[in-house]
């Protein structure tokens, strides 16, 4: 008779403990151990990604109220955002577009104070000097060069020495009007959307990570002007989404690659890609960059986001409460967020497709999944904060967010 009573006591104790854990935290972290191609385990980098449950949604207020919460979070970098690279000739050309992102943002009482359009978006050889090294070596990647080899960084930046490396695109190639850009995320909202023709009608199209277009042209189009990534997200995407058709990164004569410098391996891979040689060291040692970027890759095909630009975007637009959590050191804006904000600082007019919206639970995680998969939240990104920002920018008329 004692045995069932003991088992019942253990069961009740376990239930009480589990309930207390669920009530205790606003977020929780654990490792996703489910099998299948949709789980992106960091096989290529010794850094685990942790799940985050959005127990409490962010308030759905006006964009003025939403952004106040974003910009008042605690300072988490070793240097304030005012200590950025003093703007050098950035390669940016004046726009004749009367209703540009810059004009609309500057006229907005909230975003007019947040946007800083003269900050360099890209980094190239002229930025590498003793002053910049001393300043950025105090900040961790991707916001600086802390822990990186000066020789590795310098040898990469010295190869970014063409005019193409100083700007995303040449404005003279789009005479007499507004340069319209589409940034295409991989969200399930695009499945069945029939937005492919509208996306391809833009002058420039940004894609990222597992950017599958074959078989989904009606919904997502096929045009690719820029492919944005970190080496880690690119290689993880090739593993995780191979079963869905992502068997190689986008390649093409006119396609440009945007490197997000999240780790030493991004600088090393970029250098090897420009030189056309195998990766000489690190986690990607022996890799042939040609298989990712094509046989005719040269310096002109590559863009490198400036660490100061990433620092500015995070402190002003996407400073998350996740930074106060146990794994706050892993936090950075998502690849999609960085591509969209890059477009907003360079293009005249921007449309966002496949990004998280308020009704994200109605859609699968990705548009190419044949069966609905729930969106998974990881502790290195704050997708709900990003969703707030996209809604706010849409309401302010600064960009167009595809919703349905």
UniProtKB/Swiss-Prot annotation:
Topological domain ranges for the Cytoplasmic compartment: 1-8
Cystine residue pairs: 97-178, 181-347
Purpose: Catalyzes the transfer of N-acetylneuraminyl groups onto glycan chains in glycoproteins. Conjugates sialic acid with an alpha-2-6 linkage to N-acetylgalactosamine (GalNAc) glycan chains linked to serine or threonine in glycoproteins. Sialylates alphaGalNAc- and Galbeta1->3GalNAc-O-Ser/Thr epitopes also known as Tn and T antigens.
GO CC annotation: Golgi membrane
CDD domains per the UniProt record, alphabetical: GT29_ST6GALNAC2
Catalytic reactions on record: a beta-D-galactosyl-(1->3)-N-acetyl-alpha-D-galactosaminyl derivative + CMP-N-acetyl-beta-neuraminate = a beta-D-galactosyl-(1->3)-[N-acetyl-alpha-neuraminyl-(2->6)]-N-acetyl-alpha-D-galactosaminyl derivative + CMP + H(+); a 3-O-[N-acetyl-alpha-D-galactosaminyl]-L-threonyl-[protein] + CMP-N-acetyl-beta-neuraminate = a 3-O-[N-acetyl-alpha-neuraminosyl-(2->6)-N-acetyl-alpha-D-galactosaminyl]-L-threonyl-[protein] + CMP + H(+); a 3-O-[N-acetyl-alpha-neuraminyl-(2->3)-beta-D-galactosyl-(1->3)-N-acetyl-alpha-D-galactosaminyl]-L-threonyl-[protein] + CMP-N-acetyl-beta-neuraminate = a 3-O-{alpha-Neu5Ac-(2->3)-beta-D-Gal-(1->3)-[alpha-Neu5Ac-(2->6)]-alpha-D-GalNAc}-L-threonyl-[protein] + CMP + H(+)
Residues reported in the UniProt entry to bind CMP-N-acetyl-beta-neuraminate: 186, 209, 334, 366
Protein name, UniProt field: Alpha-N-acetylgalactosaminide alpha-2,6-sialyltransferase 2
Membrane topology: Single-pass type II membrane protein
Entry keyword Transmembrane helix: yes
Keyword annotations: Disulfide bond, Glycoprotein, Glycosyltransferase, Golgi apparatus, Membrane, Signal-anchor, Transferase, Transmembrane, Transmembrane helix
A Pfam short name: Glyco_transf_29
